[in-house]
Structure formats: structure tokens, C-alpha cells
Amino acid sequence: VGGDGIIVSKNNVQITNLSTVVGGNGGSGGVAGSAGLAGAGGKGGNGGDVPIGSPTTRGKRGEDGAFGENGINGRVGNGGAGGTAINISADGVILLNQGKVLGGTPGSINAQPGEAIVVSGKNSHIINDIGGEIWSSGLNSKAVEYEAGADNGIFEMRTNSIVDGVVDATKISNSKLVLGGNTAKENSTFIASKIGNGRQYQGFSNYEVNTSEGSTWNLIGETTALTPWTVTEGTLAIVSDHSLGSTDGALTLNGGVLQTVLNVNSDRRFNLTAESLNGGILTDGDLTLTNVISGVGGLKKTGNATLILGGQNDYTGRTIISSGNLFLTGEGGIEHSESVELSKGTSLNISSTTGGTMVNNLTGDEGSHVVLGDRFLTVNSLADSVFSGEFGAEGETGGLLKTGAASFTLAGQNNYTGDTTVSAGKLSLSGDSNIEKSGNVRLNRDATLDISATTNGTMVNNLTGDEGSHVVLGDRLLTVNSLADSVFSGEISGNGSLIKKGQGDMTLDGINSYQGITRIDQGNLRINSDQSLGGGNKNNSDLIMNGGGLKIFGSFASDRDVYFNADGDISVDKDMSSSWNKIHTGDYKFTKSGEGELIVRNGGDASEISLMNGALTLINLNMNSEKQDALLNVNNGVLNIIGGDVSAKNDLIYITGDSTINLDNVSIKSSGNGMRLSDNVQSTLSLRNQYTDMPILVEGKNSILNINAGDNTTLASNMHKSDESTINLNLMNNSSNWVISQRTDVDNVRNSGNIIFSPLNKSEFNNLNIKGDYSGGNGTITLNTVLNKGGDKDQQLSDKVLIKGNVSGETVLKVVPQGNGDNTASAPGNIFSSRDGISLVQVGGDAADNAFKLDREYISTGTKSPYQYRLFTYRGDQVDQQSNFLGDKPVNVDFRLQTAYLDSSGNVVPGVDPDYNNSNNENGNGTGNDNGTGNGNGT
């Protein structure tokens, strides 16, 4: 056998070969013997070991061969085997080959060629460096052979190195084949099909790329061998997953780069070590991974092509997308990754996931993208993060779910139309970023939406929030677009303002502290306390009605003013009462609805108000309208006006439903009707501390107006009614006055106050026509009467009270006399006649004799007049129907003024006292009874 070129027997040494090491050549065979004689032995090989039937010696000349047998039995002796170039028997040896290693040549063609390198020691590391060559010496020899027990052996080849012959690691465990390199940037190729049983590289347990940064090993060809590759440094480039061997072998990224040159599909596991982010995956072709990526490391993606992940990955390090696209599909996810970081021009695409996915601590540069499709992305914020890219492309229906206690900031343009839910932590918007296309924005308890860093505020749709949630405005403006009804029970804070848009109702039932205004443009804003509208003072936190409505479902007092920039509605729920400082409607209409009460405490100004329901109290309000419509439209409810000035170009109050109007010390002016009722309405007008001369028109069918004149009231209104409507008047006490200046038709009157006929002239007098009943509550009626002869109807010049119904109670008649007086007694024999005198009150129903009486014994025209007009009562058949002023209703009781005097016996005598003495009548009043008896005869 040829001798070994180098024998390494010392542990843990490093050997560098810069020259050529050749194993000893085997000795040549002996010469064949002649026939019949023994042949001579062959000459020993130089430098090798030649066995000639005896123990070998190294480096010596071979012994002669034994003689051959006689005759034909003679033969040539076999040559010696080639020697090993380098024999490593020690442990921990590093061999750096920068030269040439060649096994020894065999002594004959039948002898064994020598191996280049034989390793029997453990933990060896053979490096075939750039330009290094390792050659076996023949077909059956090996370039490198690891003998049994030489475990943990590493064989590394570098760029432009040569290995000719088999590298056999089949007898050892934990062996590794390394594609290495030095500091130079090189591009090398390794053929995967050389790996496997019967191939050049046999028996390795592990495979590694560990070359210099920037250097690339191109792995081409295919193998079915189990080749679990680890890329530690440098780049491993593939065109097919088959180059990586059986899919049972995982690929580990340990700081190096896996590059896909073409589109590659892989079903193998990937492992990421703590060093993985020093390398990553470079996709020049799309890479689809359907198995799981695991490990404590992170995933860094470069290259313009797409990385597609379909496995339920559980690696825990960062995910960095430096270029290209990361595409998640099916159940694919990266929810265990510490963070997801997108560079400019990159994207995270979840549109093909089964049900959306979750990422932690999402960040993105301007120009990055999150593609949602119709899926929802959950962003779990374990630390504060900012995404400055586009979250959701135009028209995408997916949405955002924010979890985690930290803050997630959207700083780019977001176009997704699905919901935004902040389950925990804070979702912040900054700059021009907004989520105004998101269908709904929901905040869970303790979650926050922060818009304080936006340029000009933002808009959100259908904002909802649990109790304990927060919206932080800073000094910005939040617009809530309510496309559907929503409830926000959290707190809105900051110096900013709130605008409500959209046709849906938005409910604020939390305690808010924002300092700015609240403006309602569309739909309804529902509140239950003044704090629902923030904590600002009335100078900077007013409520502005800009086309929408306010619905109140709580009782509270507010110091805010309410301004109307458009027609608007304020509704108060049943059993609730809400008061405000002032209202300012401008030229717009304010509508009060709901069954509760709304109070305006300190006036303001208004041009048109409609009360649809409930109660509305206006205190010291100035109302002035040039509109043709009514100033106050009352459909239903109670309208209280206390103080202030109210004037209208047309109707002042138009009533279309059952209602009550209470006026107290209001200055009223109307060019049209002061009050007008439509069909089928029952309404009450109550007056207190009030003077009003507004005309009252009850024109509708089946409508009823009840007028209550209370303390310190003067009602000077002209009242008109249709035949099918009703006016009932109640003068409640002796400070209640009703001044009549024209013919007036009413239905029922209760008089505990004063009815006063306004004086006109000697030829014009008015009638009070009462269609129904009259109740006297010790009130008075003041009438203007010309004291003349009377008699015929056209000669009875006086205001009259004409009652078609019944009369109850008592009333005092105060007659304001005109004229010179005359003797009304015209009947022969100087007797009482129901045709004589002047009728003041006619009753179609029943009335007691004392239902009406004068405020004195008699009326005269002056202190020296001989004519004493006394009030007499005629009833039934005694009534002269030719003096009927009731029209189609016969007069049943007629109260008439007639001249009469008391004779010396105290009897009432018709006519004039023939013994009249001026000295008895200095004051024009008698001293006898007020009225005659019921039959018209004096008592």
C-alpha cells in the first residue's frame, strides 16, 4: 500500500495546505515466473506500502514477490493500493485546503486507488477553499471518506473549488455539508442532484450555506434526498423547491438569504433563528409557502416579487417587508410575529385569507399598502406604532379591528369601507389621515379614538362606544356621519367641536368634556344631559342647529344658547323637562316636538316657531316675522309665552291641533289674525298679566277655543268664528277684562271679571252674541246706551248682550249713558209695557230675575234729569218678540231699561214723576230697588 502523504494525529489543530499533497503510490506487482520455474518478485513501489505476503512497512521499498509456481502455474504479483493523501485521526482538526490533495495511485489496475482525505477523528472541519482541489485517484476511491466514529464532521466547499470523487459521510452522525465562501462577493453553483445515495455527496445530516455577505450559491437541479438546509450567511438561490430535497427537510434562515429566481412553490417547513433578520427571503420570483414558518426569529422580505404564506405560522420575531408584497392566503397568518413593518412601495395583502387575520404592531412607511379585499385585519398593538401608508384600497369592503393596550396611528390615506372597531388601546389619526369611508366606527370599553394630531379634524361614520370609551379631539373638529342609528356612551374630550351629519340618530348618553360647539347638520342628535354636549361655557360651546334635530331624553338645565342656521327640530321625551339659556333662529323655523317640556329662560330672537307636541315655554323672547306664514304654529301641546315682544306680519298663532296657549305679560302685535284655529281643533288660550288686542279667528269646522282671562288681563281682541266652531270665554276674577269693540260672537261665557263694550259713537253700538250659556260669577258688563224713548228696535241705541242659552249666577250691568233722556212709558194708562224702553240683555233660555242688575238704583242723564231709567225683567209671554234681537231664537227673558219712579208710597210707577223735584236727584241716582218684578210691574 502506498504511504500516507500527511498524517494528523494531534487534536484541535488547524492545517492549511498551500501545495500538493499526494498519497503514496502502491508498489508494482511481482514478475511472472517461467513455466516450471518460480518467477522473480516484483520491485516495491516508491514511497508506498506494498504487501507481499508479510507485514507492511511504510515508506520502504517493497519486498520481492514470492516465486511463481513451476510451469504454467507461474503468475504476475498484484501491485500495492494507493496511499491516502491526508489522514486525519485526531479530534477537532480544521483543514483549510488552498492547494491540491490527490490520493495515491494503485500499483496495478487491480489494486485499490488511494483516498484523498480520510477522517477518523471527531468534530473535523474540512474547507476546500477558493481554488482548492480534492481528487480521488481512481474510479473506486473517494475524495473524502469519514470513517465510523468520526461524528460531527463538516465538509465545506467554497467558490471555484473542485471536488472530484465521492464525499462519503454515511458512516457518521450529525455531519454537515457547507456551501461556504470568504469575504469576496462570489456567485457559485452547486448541483443538488449530486446529493444522495449513490451520488457524489452521501450521508450528510445537515446542509448549510455560510458564505460571505453578498455571495450567492445557486442551487440547481433536483434531489429527493433529505437535505435540511440552513442559510447562515450569504445567499442560497433556487429556481425550484425540488433543489432543496425532500419536503420533510425544513429550511432554516439563520442570517442568510433565500433567493427565488423563478416562481417557487414549497410545502416544507421554514425555521427562523434569532439571526434570521440579518438575511431573509429575496423574491425575484414569487415564493409560495404552504407549510409553517416557526422559530424565535423574524422574517425579512426583499425583492419585487410576492411572498405568499398559506400556513398558520408561529414564528415570534419581526416581519419586515422591505420590498415587494407579502400575501396571506387561506388560513395563512403571521399573528405570532412580534411586529409587521412595511417599507415604501410594499404591501401586506390579506384579501385571500379565509376569515381575515391578525398582525402585531403594524407599521408602514408612506407609500406602503394594506390590501384587505373583503377581509378584516386585526392590528394588535403591544407597543405604539404608526402606519403611514394606505390602509385598504379604494372600494375594498374589509375593515380594521384594533386590539392591544398600546396606540396604533393611521397617518396615511385609508379607503376601506368596512367597519373600524377599537377593542382596546388607542386608534390615532394624524395629518390628513382619516377613516371617513369606514362603514361603522365602534369603541369598546376603555378604548380610544384620538384625532388630536389630524390637520383639520376628521369624519367617522356611525360612531358607537361603550361606557368608558373615549374620543380625544384636541382642538380638532370631529364630524360624525350617522347613516344608521348609533349610541355613544363614552366621553368626548378636548377643546374641539362636534358636528353631527347623516339621517340616522346619534345618541350621546355619556358625560362629555369637550369645550367646543356642537352642530347638527342632519338627522337627530339625542342627549340626556347638558354634559352630553361637553363641558364648555356658554360663550364657546353653543348648540347650532344646521338642518338636523335635537332629541332630549333626560331632564336638565343648560346655560347654552341655541342657534339656528337652518330649519330645525328640538324634541323632548315624555315626562322630561329641559331648559336652555336663549334661542336665535334668524330667518329659520324652530320646531318643538315630543311630549316633554322645553324652556327657553332668557329670550333670544325667533322668526317662526312650530309646536308639534308637549310643552314649550318662551321667556322674554323677541319674535318678529315678515313671513306670510304664521309666527307660531301650534299643532299640539302647551305653548307658554312669558314676557318679550311678539309681532307678526300675518297670523301670530295658527293652531292646527289640540293645544293650550298661555300668555303672560307679552307685548303682542299682529297685522293679521292674532290667533287662528283650523278644523277639528280644541284649544285653550290662557291670559295672565296680559293685554292683547290680537284678532281671534276660529274658522275651522268642529273647532273649540276656550279663553281663560286671568289676573291683570285685558282681552281687547275682535273674535270671529264660523257657525260650526265654538268660542268659550272665562273671565276668571275681577282683574280680568274683556273689551268689545265690534259685534262679537261666542258660544259660552263665564264672567267673574269685567266685560266692557268700548264706546264708539252715538249711532254705532255692538252686540255680544252668546250662542250657548252665560254664567255670572259676580262679574260686570259695561254697556254704552243712549237714554232715549226706545221702543222700536231701531230706536234702542245700546250695546247688547244676546244669550241664546241659559243664564246662571249674577252679573252687574254698568251703563255708560248718552243722550238727554225721555219718558219710555208709551202705553195708555201709564202702565208697564214690554215694548217700552231699551233692551240691554236678551236670553233665549232661562235666567233668574236677578241674573242681571244695575250697579245703582237707576240711571239718568244728569244730576237734574227727571228721567230715571231702571232695569226691569220680562219673561215668557210678557216679552215683546217684536223687540227680538236674538234672530231665529225667541226671547224668553228680556232685561230692559225703562223710565220709572217711586211714588210717595214707595211703589214703582212707569214714566216720569209729575212732582219731580231737582233737589231729590242731585247725583242722578235713586235709592230704591234695582229691578222691578218678573212681570214687569213695579214692586
Language-model segments: residues:
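Glycine-centered low-complexity coil/loop motifs and glycine-rich tracts
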Residues: 1-5, 18-87, 98-122, 131-150, ...
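Extracellular beta-strand-rich solenoid/capping regions of secreted or surface-exposed proteins
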Residues: 2-11, 86-89, 119, 273-275, ...
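Extracellular beta-solenoid/beta-roll
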Residues: 119-137, 142-148, 171-221, 226-240, ...
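Thr-biased low-complexity repeat/linker tracts and other Thr-enriched repetitive architectures
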Residues: 351-386, 430, 452-489, 493
